[in-house]
Amino acid sequence: MNELLEKAERLKTASQTLAMLSTEEKNAALEQIAKAIDRKRAVILAENEKDMAAGRSQGLSPALLDRLQLTNERIDQIISGVRQVASLPDPVGDIIEEWTRPNGLRIQTVRVPLGVIGMVYEARPNVTVDAVSLCLKTGNAVLLRGSSSALHSNKALVSVMKEALRTTAIPETAIELLEDTSRETAQRMFRLNDYLDVLIPRGGAGLIRSVVENATVPVLETGVGNCHIFVDESAERSMAIDIVLNAKLQRPSVCNAIETVLIHERWPYVGELLEALHARGVELRGDRRLAAAYPFVTEATEEDWHTEYLAPILAIKLVTDVDEAIQHIHRYGTKHSEAIITENEAHVRRFFQAVDAAVLYHNASTRFTDGEQFGYGAEIGISTQKLHARGPMGLVAITTTKSLVYGTGQIRTV
C-alpha cells in the first residue's frame, strides 16, 4: 500500500477516537504540543534553515522566502497560537437549536467534527501547526500536504507534534504529513473521497485553482487577496495615510495586504500619500493622470489592476466617486477584504451594501482579516466562497452538524 492510502486509513481510524474525546483531553494534548515545540525549537529552526538555503539557491522571491522563514519570534507566535486555541470554547457538542414537535419528538441540532481534513498549502510552515491545533481542538484528524520548499520544516514540526501526542488521549495518527509532494500524489489526494471529508487549500491562485478544478472531495476554498482601499473625498488625512501604509507595508507578502488604492479625485492629500509611499520604497503604478503628475509613478497596465503583488508594489487610481470605486472593486476584486476610509456615513452604508467581499472595513486596515485578530485563535484559512464558511475560518468553520431526535415510541402514520 502506498504512503497516501496508509496514512489516510490511519487518519480515518484516528478520527473516530478523536470524536469521542472531551474538551479537557483535547486541551491537554494542545498544551503538550506547545511545550514540545518550545523545547525543540532549535531542531525546528535548523531544519527550517535547510529549506531557506534551498529556497535562496533556487531563486525564490523575497515574498516566498518571508513566508517560508521561521524565527524565534515566529515560533513564539506559533506556540502562543496553539495555547490560544486551547483556551477557546470548544464548539463540539454545542446545541445550536432545540425544539419539540407536536407529536412529542424532541429535536436538537448539535455541532460535531467534520472528520478528516486535507490541508493543501504552500511555503508557510506555521500553517502546519495552525491547522493541527484547530483540527485537534474540533476533533478532526488532518492530512497535511505542504510544498516541497518547506518539507524539512514540516517534517520537523510534525515529528515534534506526534511525539508530544504519545502521552495524551489523542492518537499520534491523528496527524499525518504527506511527504511525497509530487503532483501525481496530490491529484490522488484530491479524489480520496472514501477517507477525506473536506479539502482546504491555502496558497497562491495556481494552487487554489488546481485543487478546485481537480478535486472530487468537497473543497473549502480560500481565496487570493487582491484587496483594495478606497480613500473617499472626506477621508481624514493622517488616518488615511496611516491605514494605507499599514495595509501595504506591515507585511506585504500576505493575502490581506492591499494591492490597489482608489482615491477620490477631490481628496486634497493625494500627493502626500504618494510621497509617503514612495519614501518607504513602494513601487507605484498609477493611472494616466497620476503617472503624468508624479515622476516616481509608472503608468499602470490592465494587468496591474488584476495582480496580487505580495510585494511592496501598489496600483493607484483616481476615481470620481464611491460608485466608481465600487465598480472597480466589482471588476478586479477577489472577494477577500475591501476598505473605505471616509467620514461620510451614507458612503459607508453604500460601500458595505454594494461590495461583495468576505470582510469589509470602515476606517481600518485590511490587515485585520485574520483568525487571531478576529478572536478565533489561529485560523485554518480565509474563505472567499459563500457556502459553509466565509472570511477567517476558526473552530466553528471546521465543524458540521447532526440532528439528534429523542422519542418516546413515536411512529409515522401519515
Swiss-Prot record:
Catalytic activity: L-glutamate 5-semialdehyde + phosphate + NADP(+) = L-glutamyl 5-phosphate + NADPH + H(+)
Family per record: Belongs to the gamma-glutamyl phosphate reductase family.
Gene Ontology biological process: L-proline biosynthetic process
GO molecular-function terms, A-Z: glutamate-5-semialdehyde dehydrogenase activity; NADP binding
Phylogenetic classification of the source organism: Bacteria, Bacillati, Bacillota, Bacilli, Bacillales
Pathway note: Amino-acid biosynthesis; L-proline biosynthesis; L-glutamate 5-semialdehyde from L-glutamate: step 2/2
EC id: 1.2.1.41
Predominant cellular place of this UniProt entry's protein: cytoplasm
NCBIfam families: PRK00197.1 (NF001221), proA (TIGR00407)
EC class (word): oxidoreductase
HAMAP family reported in the protein's UniProt record: ProA (MF_00412)
This protein's name: Gamma-glutamyl phosphate reductase
PROSITE patterns the record matches: PROA (PS01223)
Subcellular location: Cytoplasm
UniProt keyword terms in alphabetical order: Amino-acid biosynthesis, Cytoplasm, NADP, Oxidoreductase, Proline biosynthesis
Cellular-component GO terms for this entry: cytoplasm
Keyword Cytoplasm: yes
Pfam family, one: Aldedh
Role description: Catalyzes the NADPH-dependent reduction of L-glutamate 5-phosphate into L-glutamate 5-semialdehyde and phosphate. The product spontaneously undergoes cyclization to form 1-pyrroline-5-carboxylate.
Signal peptide (UniProt feature, chain positions): none
InterPro entries documented for this protein: Ald_DH/histidinol_DH, Ald_DH_C, Ald_DH_N, Aldehyde_DH_dom, G-glutamylP_reductase_CS, Glu-5-SA_DH, GPR_dom
